[in-house]
Amino acid sequence: MAFDQDWVPKTRLGKLVVEGQVASMDEAIKSGLPIREPQIIDMLLPDLEDEVLDINMVQRMTDSGRRVKFRATVIVGNRNGYVGLGQAKDVQVGPAIRKAIDAAKLNITYIRRGCGSWECACGLPHTVPYEVTGKAGSVSVTLIPAPRGLGIAAGNTATKVLEKAGIKDVWTKTFGTTRSTLNFAKATYDALNQVNVVRLPVYYGKEEI
């Protein structure tokens, strides 16, 4: 993603990034400072990719009549552990997508990966370390560790989210109305975040991201 050369940081973390005191995304997360400017992500993760998952027309009735807007849902990630999901609305499609990309950058998080399948003992971070479940609305998504080389056994929306997070092999189980792209993406993203809830023995006595 292109970095805005004219950016003037307004937050403490943004100033630290520009000054070079925070040089990586790991350091930014460990600092404990909130990420409130998308340009911070542009500087620290220059290889970040974005993809539009869904564009939908939404309507709202007001005193002056019916108001129509477009809602965009976007996933961003560097295919190496960092992933973010965002959505935004605007009267035009282009601005809605740009706002959703910025929202996804501000929601970016690090997903721990591992080799959690009993069928595989390669030790490489290619799948989830253990079974996790995420929910959004009526949709429930369960991610199950898979052996290396299997690929991503999931629906189209979930596959896009998992690929951006750097997950290469995984089994999935889904329940609910998965035709809802927004809830399907949110449930998958929530499942990825559940990986960070449990502290693994390998991290005992060490700093976690």
Swiss-Prot record:
State a single Gene Ontology molecular function. Answer: structural constituent of ribosome
Q: Does the keyword Transit peptide apply?
A: no
Q: Name one GO biological process term.
A: translation
The residue range of the signal peptide is none
Q: Does the keyword rRNA-binding apply?
A: yes
Question: This protein's superkingdom?
Answer: Archaea
Q: SUPFAM superfamilies, per this entry?
A: dsRNA-binding domain-like (SSF54768), Ribosomal protein S5 domain 2-like (SSF54211)
Entry's InterPro entries?
Ribosomal_Su5_D2-typ_SF, Ribosomal_uS5, Ribosomal_uS5_arc, Ribosomal_uS5_C, Ribosomal_uS5_euk/arc, Ribosomal_uS5_N, Ribosomal_uS5_N_CS, Ribsml_uS5_D2-typ_fold_subgr
A GO cellular component term found in this entry reads: cytosolic small ribosomal subunit
Xref: Gene3D superfamilies: 3.30.160.20, 3.30.230.10
| UniProt keyword list | Ribonucleoprotein, Ribosomal protein, RNA-binding, rRNA-binding
What assembly does the database describe for this protein? Part of the 30S ribosomal subunit. Contacts protein S4.
Q: What is known of its domains?
A: The N-terminal domain interacts with the head of the 30S subunit; the C-terminal domain interacts with the body and contacts protein S4. The interaction surface between S4 and S5 is involved in control of translational fidelity.
User: What is the designated name of this protein?
Assistant: Small ribosomal subunit protein uS5
Query: Which organism does this sequence originate in?
Result: Methanosarcina mazei (strain ATCC BAA-159 / DSM 3647 / Goe1 / Go1 / JCM 11833 / OCM 88)
